């Protein structure tokens, strides 16, 4: 009998188009992301993107028509059963799904277009914000904002005006951050963030993104989560770094709420690109 995959409470998909081998347009990338996310949202029941065209920006909408509608029959993926051996099958058994848009090298307007294409699951990354006008736009539109501890330190020292403005809106936003060590915990504890929802704890396992780092391991990750929860009892931990099908369950067995994946997710996104 086939063993069922353990349920993931919270699954975080992380975008990074630099992992794609092909040089594609932003519009095509947005459509591929939307497809990949929808597939995982539907617990393996694939369907063509049903996002209403009116909710998409002009560039994304134009690509939607050309790459989805015009090629409907050629682009439709095979139907997938819940018990099939699809590469992303393990990602589908989740309760909550978020997509952290990490393509912060994009110009600000293009970044916002990509977030629009991702849809309701999107978490905006604070690194894309460089001035008060941009901060105001993100504060007005984003449901969640991810501010890693290294970015917080940078804003405090080099972008003080941005940091002060953000603090004035602490009660209006839901924030995410990162925890790598005790220094990060001390920093977050000193801030008293009212709505700190998740912290990404990393790197749990070795990952090409941090060459030479052995990973902190799941036990260390659990210890860091317990420490941050003494200051933020409501905060949940997400394991990040080297997470894949064969090790994610180990994280869940150590009191970590969920897992974040980038490489495996971007492989699935690549499979949704029409070359």
Q: Where are these predicted regions, by residue range?
A:
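Conserved N-terminal beta1-alpha1 strand-loop-helix module at the mouth
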Residues: 1-52, 59-67, 71, 83, ...
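Generic beta-sheet signal
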Residues: 131, 148, 178, 201-202, ...
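Glycine-rich adenosine-cofactor-binding loop
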Residues: 235-247
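Short, flexible/disordered intra-domain loops and linkers
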Residues: 20-26, 157, 210-215, 271
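Glycine-rich phosphate-binding active-site loops on the catalytic face of alpha/beta enzymes
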Residues: 149-155, 200-212, 252-275
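Active-site-adjacent beta->alpha loops and helix N-cap segments on the catalytic face
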Residues: 105-117, 133-134, 148-166, 207-225
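Alpha-helix-loop-beta-strand connector modules within alpha/beta enzyme cores
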Residues: 117-124, 169, 177, 216-238
